[in-house]
Amino acid sequence: MTANRIKRFIKIFIATACTVAVSCQAFACKRTINIKQSEIDICADEIRNYLDAKTAQDQFTALANAMGSQLDRQYASIEYSSENGKTYRVFAFNVNDDNERFVVRGRGGKATGGLFIPGETYRLKIVGMSDYDEDFFNATAWKNQYSDYVTEEKTVKIKDSPVRFITLNSGYNYRDLGGWETETGKKICYGKIYRGARTNGFSEKDIAIFKDNLHIKSEIDLRNSNDDGGQNSSILGDDINYLKAPMSQYSYILPSFSLNGRTFDTNSPAEIKRIFEFLADEHNYPLFFHCNAGADRTGTLAFLILGSLGVTIGDLTRDFELTSFSQGGTRLRGKFQEPFEYGIMQDDANNFVAWGDMISRIKSDYPTSDGKLSSSIKKYLTTECKISAEILSKIADVLLSK
């Protein structure tokens, strides 16, 4: 990118960011997509524009138009005919997987949200009851007795996408890690592994989503005693396999790191090994990993997992930057200044965000003959974290499409 192009881009970015800052919050609340068409897109338009952008400049412009605007949810509005005095629920059934189903609450002839999986087809049953029924009012699953109250049925195809946000009532920045394609053409399976923010303060409804709909069996908590709110077990229940593995983020996990008084966290490699050994056990899935905001430590672990499986640097960066569409905080691959600096977005007393610095260090510290980032990540994991090739192979068997 030439100096003149950089200057023009920076001006566009700053001007756009200033313009949208005051309006994106209200705009996000209005954004819905109805399902009268045969295929729907559960991504907000702003996220779709970002995913479809072909150049770094277009990606950053898309981010500037919407970052921080709470778009981390599914934007499908299910419209149906309704009658006064009736309570409505929409039950969604994956036609390819009978175990994958969920409920969306309706009001005023519309039910917004859902847990749809991109690329899948769903059979929707709209159920309306006149008499108050507590089980139905708080329904999280289908019951056969609801069959007598079905008012409409329709089938809908969900547009394919590498992004599946999980809509919650009391949290933000939760999403499925599935959907990304690897260098070999395989895909990360949906419904296996989820990333997100803290679970402290989860509502009963959100706990039900994690247990009854996502079928979470395990939780990996990346926080330490300074920010975990005293949590040392899963709030999802005693039957959840809970691993506390406090690791650092970005370049802190690399022995060569030393910058502006910041240095390598010597404990991180051992914690990463514990995490990957946990990931290698197929009985721990589906699982959920998180830190506090679901951005830095979570983003670093997602990078190691997806990168070791062969997801490209472009898609690794997209997964990282998707946090910018939530309240988790803006996370970019670099910062905007003259000259343009790629690699470190923030380095001050409040935070250290160094996505590009981490990538460049891993590639230079762990070079391989094929020059692939995925190979350098594997080399780091096997040499520095002492993770066996067998462990990495088992994780691939669980998470990659056949």
Write out the residue ranges for each language-model feature:
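A general, composition-driven signal for non-globular sequence regions
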Residues: 1-5, 19, 189, 291
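Residue-level micro-sites within transmembrane alpha helices that shape
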Residues: 7-10, 24, 295-296
